[in-house]
């Protein structure tokens, strides 16, 4: 046992020296403390610590660090309400905190992120998967955009993958490529070792999946590199300390602008806390929920009066797709279709007036009763003539 211990220590020293040498060549710095944090990250994900010396991984680090550092900084600075919440849920659910970086890789922590494959939200769920995990998706809400509910769903899903494959890094790979493809890759490789599965020459897994795990590890390493964080912004070191929102009951069929006004909040800020609402009002039917800043909870409990809030029409308008042409503006398009700039912005989740040629916009269409009458009259006339 003592011999094994000394061999392990000697082996880790050799790896550390290798990394120091490589980092010296590429002008990176590695301290014993940072090296140990890297080892801890690998162990948390059930990855053999020797993977840190994998040549393909080491060679990819310089490029991945420079390419994905902005993702980390943006995620920390612009989503300071989301990252602490996710970390808290991960800790409560007793899963590796490094799973946070899966979300960063998937969506950059953007609740309104939509992939080419129509995966939505922080955790990039497809509709069938999301519904199977208990998330509500209908004409009024899309809980894939709710960072709290979707995080619990993602953790549940990842736990099931961990139970199926036995190791956390395999669960991460399966999250990206699917259970079937990972099982097939393991069978072809004759091993579930990470170094073997993401071998760039053997190509047991797609390039996307091979890069997926490398990106997660790169972001996890960067987030634990105090020198890197201090160099960018000293405040980033304590980014996990703020968690400033709470879940409260929301009345049904009420305009979001009225809720925001009642809470002394501007509408844009209220929407940032509640990205799961699809329209400018809460869903009809039984009560729902919303998120508010923690410092508003006492005010909410004392002053919030549901009976003072007017109910609004929650009928979902008919829509059409409009392709932007040269010379178009939101005002011109809104006037053409007898709607408002605000409605077009709301439906398309756009904040500015700038449009691009060939950009696709969802436009609300108001039903024209006279047009319907004329159409029916024409149909009746045609039927008479046909007889």
Q: What is the meaning of each model-derived region?
A:
Residues 202-227:
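Amphipathic alpha-helical blocks and their helix-capping loop/short-beta junctions
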Residues 221-251, 262, 267-387:
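Extracytoplasmic low-complexity/disordered linkers and repeat tracts associated with LysM-containing
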Residues 95-112, 171-176, 271-274, 344-348, ...:
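Short, functionally critical alpha-helical segments immediately adjacent to catalytic or ligand/cofactor-binding
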Residues 60-74, 109-116, 124-166, 191-203, ...:
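Substrate-binding clefts and substrate-entry loops adjacent to catalytic sites
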Residues 77, 81-84, 88, 100, ...:
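Solvent-exposed, polar/charged alpha-helical surfaces in well-ordered, non-transmembrane soluble domains
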Residues 158-188:
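Catalytic and binding regions of secreted/periplasmic enzymes and modules that target cell-wall glycans
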Residues 72-83, 92-95, 115-123, 143-154, ...:
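Solvent-exposed, acidic/flexible segments
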Residues 2, 11-13, 23-94, 99:
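An acidic, Gly/Ser/Thr/Pro-rich helix-cap/linker signature
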């Amino acid at each position: 046992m003592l011999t094994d211990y000394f061999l392990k220590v000697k082996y880790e020293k050799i790896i550390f020296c290798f990394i120091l040498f490589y980092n010296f060549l590429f002008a990176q710095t590695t301290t014993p403390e940072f090296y140990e944090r890297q080892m801890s990250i690998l162990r948390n994900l059930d990855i053999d610590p020797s993977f840190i010396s994998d040549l393909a991984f080491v060679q990819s680090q310089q490029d991945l660090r420079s390419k994905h550092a902005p993702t980390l900084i943006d995620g920390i600075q612009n989503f300071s309400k989301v990252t602490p919440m996710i970390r808290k849920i991960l800790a409560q659910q007793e899963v590796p905190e490094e799973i946070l970086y899966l979300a960063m890789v998937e969506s950059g922590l953007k609740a309104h992120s939509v992939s080419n494959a129509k995966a939505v939200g922080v955790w990039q769920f497809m509709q069938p998967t999301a519904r199977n995990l208990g998330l509500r998706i209908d004409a009024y809400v899309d809980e894939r955009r709710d960072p709290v509910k979707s995080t619990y769903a993602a953790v549940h899903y990842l736990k099931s993958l961990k139970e199926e494959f036995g190791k956390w890094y395999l669960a991460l790979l399966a999250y990206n490529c699917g259970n079937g493809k990972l099982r097939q890759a393991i069978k072809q490789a004759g091993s579930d070792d990470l170094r073997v599965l993401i071998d760039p020459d053997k190509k047991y897994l797609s390039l996307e999946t091979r890069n997926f795990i490398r990106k997660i590890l790169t972001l996890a390493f960067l987030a634990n590199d105090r020198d890197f964080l201090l160099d960018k912004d000293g405040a980033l070191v304590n980014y996990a300390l703020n968690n400033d929102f709470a879940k409260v009951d929301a009345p049904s069929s009420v305009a979001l602008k009225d809720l925001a006004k009642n809470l002394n909040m501007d509408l844009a800020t209220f929407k940032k806390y509640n990205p799961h609402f699809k329209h400018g009002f809460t869903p009809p039917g039984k009560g729902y929920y919303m998120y508010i800043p923690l410092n508003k909870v006492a005010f909410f409990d004392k002053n919030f009066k549901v009976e003072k809030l007017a109910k609004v029409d929650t009928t979902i308008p008919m829509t059409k797709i409009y392709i932007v042409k040269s010379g178009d503006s939101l005002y011109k398009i809104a006037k053409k279709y007898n709607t408002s700039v605000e409605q077009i912005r709301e439906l398309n989740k756009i904040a500015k007036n700038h449009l691009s040629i060939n950009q696709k916009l969802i436009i609300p269409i108001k039903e024209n009763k006279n047009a319907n009458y004329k159409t029916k009259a024409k149909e009746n006339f045609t039927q008479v003539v046909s007889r």
